[in-house]
């Protein structure tokens, strides 16, 4: 079992949590919605294979108003007509910031996303994506466990 990075250096973890709160505050102030931010977090966590963050942010996305169907179809968002132009833009940012290095295609996606979102919300989306990628890596390296939950979202064990 890995060492929990957050427990080994709680002062660094506290700084990371403050950073995350600052990113969230800045994103909301610049026009990104909670729903959009959570879509970024879930999609990046899917791409990174971070079970702990997927569990957390899928719940938070539902609390923010994202439907279960939107979450279920997220891996195939490009193939559905369900997602709004803004949702598609933030999902493109999530993917470009997570799957590195940037390619010609991801650069084109970022350019299109910036056009849709405007500079402030676009930069906010990039910060949200960068932050969740940090937390994905912390959770993956720490092997943070996912606890079973019932239909009501409460832990069952």
Task: Report residues per predicted region.
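Hydrophobic alpha-helical segments
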Residues: 1-157
């Amino acid at each position: 079992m890995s060492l929990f990075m957050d427990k080994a250096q709680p002062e660094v973890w506290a700084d990371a949590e403050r950073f995350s709160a600052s990113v969230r505050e800045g994103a909301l102030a610049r026009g990104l919605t909670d729903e959009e931010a959570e879509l970024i977090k879930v999609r990046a966590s899917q791409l990174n294979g971070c079970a702990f963050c997927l569990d957390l942010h899928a719940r938070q996305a539902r609390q923010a108003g994202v439907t279960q169907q939107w979450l279920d179809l997220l891996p195939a968002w490009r193939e559905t007509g369900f997602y709004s132009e803004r949702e598609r833009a933030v999902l493109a940012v999530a993917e470009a910031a997570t799957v590195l290095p940037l390619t010609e295609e991801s650069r084109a996606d970022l350019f299109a996303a910036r056009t849709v979102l405007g500079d402030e919300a676009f930069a906010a989306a990039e910060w949200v994506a960068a932050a969740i990628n940090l937390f994905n890596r912390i959770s993956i390296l720490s092997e943070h466990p996912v606890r079973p939950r019932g239909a009501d979202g409460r832990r069952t064990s």
